[in-house]
Amino acid sequence: MSQQQTLPVTLPPALSQELLKTVPPPANTQQDQMKQPTPSPAPCQKGPSELPVEKHPAPVKQVPEQECEPQQQDHQEPELQLGRKQQEPQEQEVHPGKQQQKPQEQEAHLGKKQEPQGQEVHLGKQQQKTQEQEVHLGKQQQELQEQEVHLEKQLQEPQEVHLEKQLQEQEVHLEKQLQEPEPELNLGKQQQEPQEQEAYLGKQQQELPEPQDPELHLGKQQQEPQEQEVQLEKQQEAQEQELHLGKQQQESQEQELHLRKLQQVPQEPQDQELHLGKQQQELQEQEVHLGKQLQEPQEQELHLGRQQQELQEEEVHLGMKEEQLLKHVEQQEGQLEQQEGQLKQPVCIPTPGQVQDIQPAQPPKGEVLLPTEKQQKQEVQWPLKQE
């Protein structure tokens, strides 16, 4: 809808009442009035209703409840239409107010469009800072890697060559530091950036036109807390930058101390020689320790082999003992059998004065004679005791 069509229209009460009276009822109600000249009762009657007729009185058919309800709705529809017509002028009065607010909002939106340009400049500066920081970190990582490689070379190269290279590297490193910008200049530049941002914001505030309407002034007042939040965020960023600068200063100081220590190293070659000698001793001790660790499993294997040999020898010795015991048992059994046979033979009793020649019993073939002491124990004691 255009602005010309949505202008508010106010009517006097007299005209509005005449319009209400002249509103035609719907077609359904007109037909009902033509059919029923007499007013119908409000509640629907279930019983038969008779209409007075002059000549031919006839009973009127029963009207169901469902036909009564649409008639009541037909009477309510014109009232609803009138209520809607009264609401339309009020809505038309509200709509122009909204249309008046639209140009004001457009002006405020145009003012906001100018702010992203300053934000883009600020973002570009921040991106440059992050890139510089990344480059600085990359340089630090390269220096650390170079130091590690340098230490590895120190262990491998002789002392004289190492000292010469160390002096050359120190000279190169000092030249690089002299060529690089000092950290104090970087600090000054970073401190100037927030001041430049404040000046830029002041210029933007001056360039903005003065508010012509109170509604624009209210819109700006609503924007002020948002701008304050942005300023707080910028202040936090500045604080973080200051902390980062402090860390950078500490790192530069540590680097200076490291350089001083490196400069003092050539003045103390004896200490370096002692340190290298200690390192070589430690390496030798580690090699000896590793050699011992390698020898231990070999010694363990030899010890196990010896134990296995001893076990095998013990098994052989036990087998021999078992064989000897078996032979000894067999010999004793044979001797017992011989003694039993001798006891069964008649014994000659010698007379006094006669000497009896005692001949040792000859064992059968394949048997071993017992020692003399055992034979004497087994001999019969003469003379026999008389009971």
Curated annotation (Swiss-Prot):
The listed locations are:
Cytoplasm
| Keywords of the record | Cytoplasm, Keratinization, Repeat
Keyword Repeat attached: yes
Q: How is it modified after translation?
A: Substrate of transglutaminase. Specific glutamines or lysines are cross-linked to keratins, desmoplakin and to inter involucrin molecules.
- What is the predominant subcellular site recorded for this chain? cytoplasm
Show the ranges annotated as biased composition (Low complexity). 62-71
Bias category Basic and acidic residues: which stretches? 85-96, 104-115, 147-179, 231-245
Expression across tissues: Keratinocytes of epidermis and other stratified squamous epithelia.
Ranges annotated as biased composition (Polar residues):
28-37
Q: Where is this region: Disordered?
A: 1-319, 347-387
Whom does it interact with, and what assembly results? Directly or indirectly cross-linked to cornifelin (CNFN).
Reported function = Part of the insoluble cornified cell envelope (CE) of stratified squamous epithelia.
| UniProt record similarity statement | Belongs to the involucrin family.
> What is this protein's name?
Involucrin
